Regions:
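Glycine-centered small-residue hotspots that permit tight backbone geometry or close packing
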Residues: 29-31, 39-42, 69, 80-84, ...
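Ampiphathic alpha-helical segments that act as solvent-exposed interaction surfaces
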Residues: 49, 87-91, 99, 103-104, ...
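Generic detector of contiguous secondary-structure segments
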Residues: 8-12, 78, 116-119
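Flexible, acidic/Gly-rich N-terminal and inter-domain linker regions that tether
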Residues: 1-60, 64, 72
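Acidic-residue sensor for enzyme active/binding pockets
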Residues: 22, 96, 121
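Canonical Radical SAM [4Fe-4S] cluster-binding loop centered on the CxxxCxxC motif
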Residues: 54-99
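Conserved AdoMet/S-adenosylmethionine-binding subsite of the radical SAM
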Residues: 102-113, 118-254
């Protein structure tokens, strides 16, 4: 059997051995339970997250692989052990998303989030933008047998130095969100992990752009449609989260 399905508390992890892909769908406890950055004005203290039944109809989160393995060699990830075997085709990307939706058995949901964040660096795959647009057309067609009222695909990027088309990809992604995304547009997450450049270089093995270079690219991008771009950090006691450095490198308005 080429497809192995592992059930989780709120969804399934799908491993397609024949295609060499892994993807999943889960429910979501809601953004109100996420820890926010106080320097951005998010001061709510999270004491606990109430255990409750997650309803997939309210928010279905599908996470897919954009590549088979990954050309990045991050020291915190197992993907380098698999090697790199190329980009997922546009048909393959759409298949991951539609298969996950089909297995969820959701026909008409409130919100669909698609995260290009499982295996691979999505900005290396030019078909990611087109696949996200095609999914928008499928689920927002009133005559479709599967529909969602809101749609929010998200690209999570490590900002690779070697991607000569990085700026164009990010520009195309943000602009596509204005036309094909819901009120939040298309989401964009940057894997920063720490504000210490030496630690970042160790984590990403020197394959990610510097903080200044990332900040400069973000400043050149169109403004997000509504939801601001996200900076992701690996929060530990040793992680540098200096708010002054955040202000130095990154535009709070974006």
């Amino acid at each position: 059997m080429s497809r192995v399905i592992t059930k989780t508390r709120t969804g399934n992890i799908i491993s397609d051995e024949e295609l060499g892909l892994e993807y999943l769908f889960v429910g979501d406890y809601g953004k109100e339970n996420n820890i926010k950055a106080s320097f951005l004005g998010y001061d709510k203290r999270i004491e606990r997250v109430e255990h409750r039944q997650v309803t997939l109809e309210n928010k279905l989160v599908v996470t897919v692989s954009s590549q088979k393995g990954c050309p990045m060699k991050c020291n915190f990830c197992d993907c380098p052990k698999l090697g790199f075997h190329g980009n997922v085709s546009k048909v393959g990307l759409i298949s991951e998303i539609t298969t996950a939706i089909a297995l969820s058995e959701i026909k008409h949901g409130e919100r669909l989030n698609v995260h290009f964040a499982r295996m691979g660096e999505p900005t290396f795959n030019k078909y990611v933008v087109g696949a996200a647009i095609d999914i928008a057309n499928i689920i927002q067609d009133k005559d479709s047998d599967v529909t969602f009222k809101e749609y929010h695909p998200v690209v999570s990027t490590m900002m690779p130095k070697s991607n000569k088309n990085l700026k164009q990809f990010l520009y195309d992604w943000v602009k596509a969100g204005y036309e094909y995304g819901s009120e939040d547009g298309f989401g964009l997450q940057f894997s920063i992990n720490t504000l210490d450049e030496n630690d970042r270089n160790a984590m990403f093995r020197g394959m990610s752009l510097s903080l200044k270079e990332i900040g400069d690219i973000i400043s050149e991008l169109p403004n997000p449609k509504k939801r601001k771009f996200t900076l992701n950090f690996a929060v530990t006691s040793k992680c540098n989260l200096d708010p002054d450095l955040m202000e130095k490198y990154f535009d709070q308005e974006k």
